[in-house]
Each structure stands twice: as structure tokens, then as C-alpha cells.
Swiss-Prot record:
Annotated TM spans: none
InterPro entries with a match to the protein in the record: Chaperonin_Cpn60_CS, Cpn60/GroEL, Cpn60/GroEL/TCP-1, GroEL-like_apical_dom_sf, GROEL-like_equatorial_sf, TCP-1-like_intermed_sf
Alphabetized PROSITE patterns for the sequence: CHAPERONINS_CPN60 (PS00296)
One GO cellular component term: cytoplasm
Assigned EC number: 5.6.1.7
HAMAP family per the UniProt record, alphabetical: CH60 (MF_00600)
Assembly description: Forms a cylinder of 14 subunits composed of two heptameric rings stacked back-to-back. Interacts with the co-chaperonin GroES.
Annotated gene: groEL
The species this protein was found in: Sulfurimonas denitrificans (strain ATCC 33889 / DSM 1251) (Thiomicrospira denitrificans (strain ATCC 33889 / DSM 1251))
Coiled-coil zones: none
UniProt GO MF annotations: ATP binding; ATP-dependent protein folding chaperone; isomerase activity; unfolded protein binding
CDD domains: GroEL
Protein name, as recorded: Chaperonin GroEL
Source organism, top-level taxon: Bacteria
Localization: Cytoplasm
Length: 542
């Protein structure tokens, strides 16, 4: 396929048009008075959203060069969402502001490489001042405020996220699901939960709830399949003498072994239940070891020299209670010591810091949460499917922003933190590097300007008022139109969101500004069918 090449200003101007179009669609969602965007889907109903990254992902421009620019900034929004959980609109608005400011200077003759160096130095200096102004998040109230802001000022969502985080801890897992009704709900599962249910319905003890509930059980952990009863008999006999129930967690329990366990359960000889071990392959072995640490048991594995036939009571774990349904198993109050559990948690955190795979990191985070003792499920209720999707997006954003705030602290919100940090930058630069620094210092005012514009206020007046305030915590409350102490008013942002948004925006804008050529595919010319008129009929045809 043939390709076209365009150079210098022509290339950069085309990319800039694409970036501007994407930004125009995304920026209207910014702030407490931001507007909704209606998106047509190829299937189902259109969706209404105020989530910047959802808007960005839907944009596909017809002009290939413009689309290249839009796609690069789309990537900034997605990367910011992935890394910080929020700040996608901020990153998009910043990238556009930096690129458009820089483009004017480069078109006028500035050296793009020197401009980039100045931009990088300014960005580094701003982040230093931003970090210095941040505060450690402290208590349920701060968490609720961060979550409320990210959920577009929905206090109910903010309070629910704060409650969930209080119950499961900072390392706990909080998931978001759709509720069956219109009311929001919070379910907290205490203890370790994994997604494996009972291997036979005959293990059920509570027929009303269809669950197997076992009090004060022994727990046998094995990383192999159990098919023969002969290997199990020695440990079963020892368990029976204690008159306590037994839970078997193994790769699988099948054939003769499973049928005999069921018969013993039905006859009342032994209160027993069996589930498959969670995960697959090496991850299964790791999760079995997690359960062993939590319950003070030992995994029966040939790799460690243990055999099923040689298992004794000393190898079994313990817990105060276990609840099993057809899909999940919950272990409550395992007998493992807090020191052993903490050592395992620390080991998993080290793995999380060294792995480069996002998937592995996610799975390690799940294991961390299970060991830390809690899983909270926020069930989002709404009257329609469209409202449900929009609300679920907001809850996801708020949850991610809250985790970022807990991780790296908070700064004043509403775009004011960047403006205040920029006012403190005093770099001794000259030439085109100075121009690069000034580009960043002008561009970081864009989020505050956009929030003011969306709320119907004069952007220039608002920025001047915030810059001129003597109290460093003063910012603009776009919901009320007042200048307030942002910390006292609860208008706060996670430092991590501002850091990631500015870093990513500067990075992509720098790349676009130093682009000297763009290559794109030319559309294929469709060949028309040959003209068949004037041809005689074939011989012998009627």
C-alpha cells in the first residue's frame, strides 16, 4: 500500500488539529459543573458519560493525520487512568495546552529540542513544589472527600467508598458490581475469599442459603489430585477422633475419594467438605501457600517431601469458621500468627514492586488483599442501564483516585495546586529553554481555566484571583463560585493524579513538538467494474 509523507509545520499542524478535536470533546466534562457527553454505540443504547477517558476512547477521526494526533493523546488519557486511576481529563487538557503553546513558538523559529529541555526542567520543578504542598491523607473524612470529588460531588458514593476502605484496610480489595435494584449497597466479606465452591451439593449444611457452613474445622491442603481413598484414610481417622469437621482444599477430589467422602457425610460419620484449590499452575501453589500461612497449616506436596498417606493432624490448618457456596469459599479467622501473615504480605509486596506484568501485579494485589483480611463489594444501583453504566464509571474513578490519595497524599483540588506550584518556580534559564519553561508555566493554568469556563465564570479573572491569594490553600470552588480554603472545603485531589497527568502530558506534547515528519497510508482506490454494455449474447443462449 502506498504511503504519503508530510514534513515540519504541515505535519505538526495536522497533528494539532486532531489533538484539539479530541480535547474539545473531553474538556467539557471537567469540574463539578462539567457537562455530559452522549456517545453512540455500534450496538445497544447510546451512553451518557462524564468520564473523560470513556469519551476519549470513543473518538476516531476520519482524517488519518488528525487521528494520529488524537490517538497519541488518547494514549495519554488511558495511561494516566491505568497508573493513577483518575486525572484523564486533566492530562488531556494539559497535553493540548502544552502542544498548542509550544507549536506557536516552534513555528516562530524556536529550536524544538531546546524547548523540550526547558519544558522538562519546568515540569520537574513544578512536581517538586507540588509534592512539598501535599498532605498525608488522614482518616475516613479525608478519604470520603477525595472519593466525593472524583465521583462528581456525589457524597453518597464518597461515604460508601470511605466506609469500604475503613473496613477492609488500605491493602484490601474493593470491587464494583451492578446491583439488582436501584439502591446502592456495600457488602464486606471478612476473611479470605477465593472463587471455588463445594465439589458436591451433598456437602451443604444450610439448605435455606444453599451453603456449607463449618465451625472450627481442620483444613487439609494438597497441591495434587485426590482420587484414591487409601491415601486419605490415615488422616481421616485422626480427624474423626477429634470430633471436628474437615475441609479438603486440593487440585481436585474425584472418583472413589469424592464418593466416599459424600457417603461419610450423609451417614454422619464425619462432617466434611471439599473444594478445588484456587488458581492454576504456579499461581495455585502460591495461593495454597497463602492459605497455609493464614491457617497455620502445611501444604501436602511431593515437592516439599510430604505425601498424603503420611499426613497427620500437625499438617492441618485451622480456622474459626468456613462458609462455602456453589461459587466461593470464605475462611474466617485462620489460626496463623499475625507475624507469619505479615511476613507473607511483605514478600508479596516485594514481588509486586519487581514484576513488570500488569496482569501479574493485579493477581498479586488480589492475593495481598485476601491475606490482609477483607474484600468489599460496592453494588451500584440505578433505574436504567444507561444510568447504571454512567454511575459505575464514576464509582470506578472515585475508587481509583482514593487509592492514589492514600498512596501518595493529597493536594488542593480544582486545578489550583498546579497554579500555586507554578508560581513558585524560579529557574535561571535562557534562550529557547526559557521559552520551554514559560510554555509549561502557561499551560498548567489550563485545567483551572477549563473548570471555571464550564461553570460559567471568566477564566482569566479566576486564575488571577487564585494566583494573587495570600493563603496558599485558596482555590476556586466552581460549584458555588466562591474562593475558599480548599482543604477546609474538602476540595482535594490526590498528588499522584496531578503528578502522573503532568508527566504524561509533558511527555507526549514534547514528542509531538519534536516531530519533523509524519507518514500515513493513502486510501486504496476502488477499481470500478468493467462496462459490460455492448457485449453480444453468448451463442445458444435465449
Amino acid at each position: 500500500m502506498a504511503k504519503e509523507i508530510i514534513f515540519s509545520d504541515n505535519a505538526r499542524n495536522a497533528l494539532a488539529r486532531g489533538v484539539a478535536k479530541l480535547t474539545d470533546a473531553v474538556k467539557v466534562t471537567m469540574g463539578p459543573r462539567g457537562r455530559n457527553v452522549l456517545i453512540q454505540k455500534s450496538y445497544g443504547n447510546p451512553i451518557i458519560t462524564k468520564d473523560g477517558v470513556s469519551v476519549a476512547r470513543e473518538i476516531e477521526l476520519q482524517d488519518k493525520l488528525e487521528n494520529m494526533g488524537a490517538t497519541l493523546v488518547k494514549d495519554v488519557a488511558s495511561r494516566t487512568a491505568d497508573e493513577a486511576g483518575d486525572g484523564t481529563t486533566t492530562a488531556t487538557v494539559l497535553a493540548n495546552a502544552i502542544f498548542s503553546e509550544g507549536l506557536r513558538n516552534i513555528t516562530a523559529g524556536a529550536n524544538p529540542i531546546e524547548v523540550k529541555r526547558g519544558m522538562d526542567k519546568a515540569c520537574e520543578e513544578i512536581l517538586k513544589h507540588l509534592k512539598a504542598s501535599s498532605k498525608v491523607i488522614n482518616g475516613k473524612k479525608d478519604i470520603a472527600q477525595v472519593a466525593t470529588i472524583s465521583a462528581n460531588s456525589d457524597t453518597a458514593i464518597g461515604d460508601m467508598i470511605a466506609e469500604a476502605m475503613e473496613k477492609v484496610g488500605q491493602d484490601g480489595v474493593i470491587t464494583v458490581e451492578e446491583a439488582k435494584g436501584i439502591v446502592d449497597e456495600l457488602d464486606v466479606v471478612e476473611g479470605m475469599q477465593f472463587d471455588r465452591g463445594y465439589l458436591s451439593p451433598y456437602f451443604i449444611t444450610n439448605t435455606e442459603k444453599m451453603t456449607a457452613e463449618i465451625e472450627n474445622p481442620w483444613i487439609l491442603l494438597a497441591d495434587s489430585k485426590i482420587a484414591s481413598l487409601k491415601d486419605l484414610l490415615p488422616v481421616l481417622e485422626q480427624v474423626q477422633k477429634t470430633s471436628r469437621p474437615l475441609l479438603i482444599i486440593a487440585e481436585d477430589v474425584e472418583g472413589e475419594a469424592l464418593s466416599t467422602l459424600v457417603v461419610n457425610k450423609l451417614r454422619g460419620v464425619l462432617n466434611i467438605s471439599a473444594v478445588k484449590a484456587p488458581g492454576f499452575g504456579d499461581r495455585r501453589k502460591a495461593m495454597l501457600q497463602d492459605i497455609a500461612v493464614l491457617t497455620a497449616g502445611t501444604v501436602i506436596s511431593e515437592e516439599t517431601g510430604h505425601t498424603l498417606s503420611g499426613a497427620t493432624i500437625q499438617h492441618l490448618g485451622q480456622a474459626s469458621r468456613i462458609v462455602i457456596d456453589k461459587d466461593n469459599t470464605v475462611i474466617v479467622n485462620g489460626a496463623g500468627t499475625s507475624e507469619a501473615v505479615q511476613a507473607r504480605v511483605d514478600a508479596i509486596k516485594v514481588q509486586m514492586n519487581t514484576t513488570t506484568s500488569e496482569y501479574d501485579k493485579e493477581k498479586l494485589q488480589e492475593r495481598l488483599a485476601k491475606l490482609s483480611g477483607g474484600v468489599a463489594v460496592i453494588k451500584v444501583g440505578a433505574a436504567s442501564e444507561t444510568e447504571m453504566k454512567e454511575k459505575k464509571d464514576r464509582v470506578d474513578d472515585a475508587l481509583s483516585a482514593t487509592k492514589a490519595a492514600v498512596e501518595e497524599g493529597i493536594v488542593i483540588g480544582g486545578g489550583a495546586a498546579l497554579v500555586r506550584a507554578g508560581a513558585k518556580v524560579k529557574l535561571d534559564l535562557s534562550g529557547d529553554q526559557k521559552i520551554g519553561c514559560e510554555i509549561i508555566l502557561r499551560a498548567i493554568k489550563a485545567p483551572l481555566k477549563q473548570i471555571a469556563t464550564n461553570a460559567g465564570y471568566d477564566a482569566g479573572v479566576v486564575v488571577n484571583a487564585v494566583e494573587g491569594a495570600t493563603n496558599e490553600n485558596i482555590g476556586f470552588n466552581a460549584a458555588t463560585g466562591e474562593y475558599v480554603d480548599m482543604f477546609e472545603a474538602g476540595i482535594i485531589d490526590p498528588f499522584k493524579v496531578g503528578r502522573v497527568a503532568l508527566t504524561n502530558a509533558t511527555s507526549i506534547a514534547s514528542l509531538l513538538l519534536t516531530t519533523e515528519a509524519a507518514i500515513y497510508e493513502l486510501p486504496e482506490e476502488k477499481s470500478s467494474m468493467p462496462d459490460m454494455s455492448g457485449m453480444g449474447g453468448m451463442p445458444g443462449m435465449m
